[in-house]
Amino acid sequence: MPTTGNYFHLHLVSDSTGETLITVARAVAAQYANVTPVEHVYPLVRSQKQLDRVLDEIEEAPGIVLFTLLEKDLVSRLEAKCQQINIPSLSIIGPVMQLFEAYLGASTAGRVGAQHVLNAEYFARIDALNYTMLHDDGQMVDGLEDADVVLVGVSRTSKTPTSIYLANRGVRTANVPLVPGIPIPHQLETLKKPLVVSLHATPERLIQVRQNRLLSMGAESGNETYVDKQSVTDEVAYARKLSARFNWVMLDVTRRSIEETAAAILKLYTDRQRQRLPE
């Protein structure tokens, strides 16, 4: 493997922001735990002069080259250079565009950065983020009916990060903590429009997460109940009882990442929206 030590060079060349490349590259690189990519990101490469600098740096530090370029002259020159110095290169969007062209029977418009145009979807995400931040952790419960999704759960079931992730997908998300001994907001009992999802985890997992949280905060005492196994088990039972009573969808997040939890909720939400469409 052509690496130096435990790292390799990864060149990401884009005529736009490079976000697509970074996301794809990091997702793949994460599968190789024993080697670390040294990222060289080149955004907004739209001229031959800008490409000159990129090619010089690639030649100085050879490695994998991934790109999202629409200008054919730039693509041809980049690929030729990589072939000349014997390093791999791949267009991330090229195969996808070819598939679209073959199926739709039409070529692309070739609009650089078209995916970042300020459209209705963009403003929907901004609106969702604003809503979610205002309705985090049980705040402003009078506005719960305006949510697309309401997450409930005991402490450390990842309600807030999951809410923010969903908001970034344009889903207006509120979250409300479930605490034994504290009545839930009456607004939560009568919701009609939002999908209510109750996040659950095993007591063992919750205790582990909570202990790590306390350590990070430097709190060593005074929180025995927070991590006591019986107390946490009672919390979980309380949350399950409420979920069954109000017919909330229950989702086990014990072994799920934030992304996996959000993906499961998005599927539930999408399926629910589809069922509500008129025949």
Curated annotation (Swiss-Prot):
It catalyses: N(tele)-phospho-L-histidyl/L-threonyl-[pyruvate, phosphate dikinase] + ADP = N(tele)-phospho-L-histidyl/O-phospho-L-threonyl-[pyruvate, phosphate dikinase] + AMP + H(+); N(tele)-phospho-L-histidyl/O-phospho-L-threonyl-[pyruvate, phosphate dikinase] + phosphate + H(+) = N(tele)-phospho-L-histidyl/L-threonyl-[pyruvate, phosphate dikinase] + diphosphate. GO terms for molecular function: ADP binding; ATP binding; phosphotransferase activity, phosphate group as acceptor; protein serine/threonine kinase activity. Its EC number is 2.7.11.32, 2.7.4.27. It is an enzyme of class 2 (transferase). Pfam families: Kinase-PPPase (PF03618). Keywords: Kinase, Nucleotide-binding, Serine/threonine-protein kinase, Transferase. It comes from the Bacteria. InterPro entries: Kinase-pyrophosphorylase, PPDK_reg. ADP binds at residues 153-160. Belongs to the pyruvate, phosphate/water dikinase regulatory protein family. PDRP subfamily. Bifunctional serine/threonine kinase and phosphorylase involved in the regulation of the pyruvate, phosphate dikinase (PPDK) by catalyzing its phosphorylation/dephosphorylation. NCBIfam families: PRK05339.1 (NF003742). This is Putative pyruvate, phosphate dikinase regulatory protein. The lineage of its organism: Bacteria, Pseudomonadati, Pseudomonadota, Alphaproteobacteria, Hyphomicrobiales.
